[in-house]
């Protein structure tokens, strides 16, 4: 299968997987127009849509796409049932698309019903995990988000993390503010800065590398613990995650 990214709005990415026959899967189409343009340019035949959560910048294009291609099956969590979903899926279930099984993973935090889809090596994680960061807590708790991103972090090393936003540069600036002397973070920041200066995408990222540079995935790292302990003594990784999320919200 071929992985394609379609820019939308200011910083969204709509992901499309296509097979050799031209059948395709569309993930979180917040806007129909760029998707329709890509379909026409590549002669794709849409088979399915995956929705991760109910926010408009992820579901806004569904209605128009379904009107154009009525055969499309729209998979999504319960919270997207009024956004065009025709097949509600939940944690532990699978969606069979393009000849592949995609596992559904519940990841509450950004929204309460947020889900992700995984079929090795592809992880479509919506607004749960970003390169260098994680989603804001609009509905869920820090505890829920901590558990959610750790579920994703446990996936295979070679997983391709397909995030829904180009937030990498700002996330790495935050990471540097927390761990300014970390070599992995500094190296990745320079790489990301160069890519964005050329208006190039920083995604997808390999999960093995992401674990090294994402401070939200390093809550048991001694360097991070020492930094946090300078301000407050927190015994549990979950508490350290909440501290980081609060810092990022104010960054």
UniProtKB/Swiss-Prot annotation:
The keyword Nucleus does not apply. Zn(2+) 1 binds at residues 53, 55, 110, 127. GO terms for biological process: methylglyoxal catabolic process to D-lactate via S-lactoyl-glutathione. It comes from the Bacteria. It catalyses: an S-(2-hydroxyacyl)glutathione + H2O = a 2-hydroxy carboxylate + glutathione + H(+). Belongs to the metallo-beta-lactamase superfamily. Glyoxalase II family. This is Hydroxyacylglutathione hydrolase. One of its GO terms (molecular function) is hydroxyacylglutathione hydrolase activity. The gene is gloB. PANTHER family: HYDROXYACYLGLUTATHIONE HYDROLASE, HYDROXYACYLGLUTATHIONE HYDROLASE GLOB. The keyword ATP-binding does not apply. Pathway: Secondary metabolite metabolism; methylglyoxal degradation; (R)-lactate from methylglyoxal: step 2/2. Keywords: Hydrolase, Metal-binding, Zinc. Thiolesterase that catalyzes the hydrolysis of S-D-lactoyl-glutathione to form glutathione and D-lactic acid. Its EC number is 3.1.2.6. It comes from Escherichia coli (strain SE11). Zn(2+) 2 binds at residues 57-58, 127, 165. Its cofactor is Zn(2+). Binds 2 Zn(2+) ions per subunit.
């Amino acid at each position: 299968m071929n992985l394609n990214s379609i820019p939308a709005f200011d910083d969204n990415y709509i992901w499309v997987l296509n097979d050799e026959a031209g059948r395709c899967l569309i993930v979180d189409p917040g806007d129909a127009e760029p998707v329709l343009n890509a379909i026409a340019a590549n002669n794709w035949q849409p088979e399915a849509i995956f929705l991760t959560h109910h926010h408009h910048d992820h579901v806004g294009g569904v209605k128009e796409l379904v009107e154009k291609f009525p055969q499309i099956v729209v998979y999504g969590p319960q919270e997207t049932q009024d956004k065009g979903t025709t097949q509600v899926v939940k944690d532990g279930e699978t969606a069979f698309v393009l000849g592949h099984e995609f596992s559904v993973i519940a990841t509450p935090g950004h929204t309460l019903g947020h889900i992700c889809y995984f079929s090795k090596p592809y992880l479509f994680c919506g607004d749960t995990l970003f390169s260098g960061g994680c989603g804001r807590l609009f509905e869920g708790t820090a505890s829920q988000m901590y558990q959610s991103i750790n579920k994703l972090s446990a996936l295979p090393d070679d997983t391709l993390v397909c995030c829904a936003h180009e937030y990498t540069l700002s996330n790495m600036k935050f990471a540097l503010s927390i761990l300014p002397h970390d070599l992995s973070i500094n190296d990745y920041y320079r790489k990301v800065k160069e890519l964005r200066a050329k208006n190039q995408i920083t995604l997808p990222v390999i999960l093995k590398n992401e674990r090294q540079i994402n401070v939200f995935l390093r809550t048991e790292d001694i360097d991070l613990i020492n930094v946090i302990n300078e301000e407050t003594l927190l015994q549990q990784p979950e508490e350290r995650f909440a501290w980081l999320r609060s810092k990022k919200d104010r960054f």
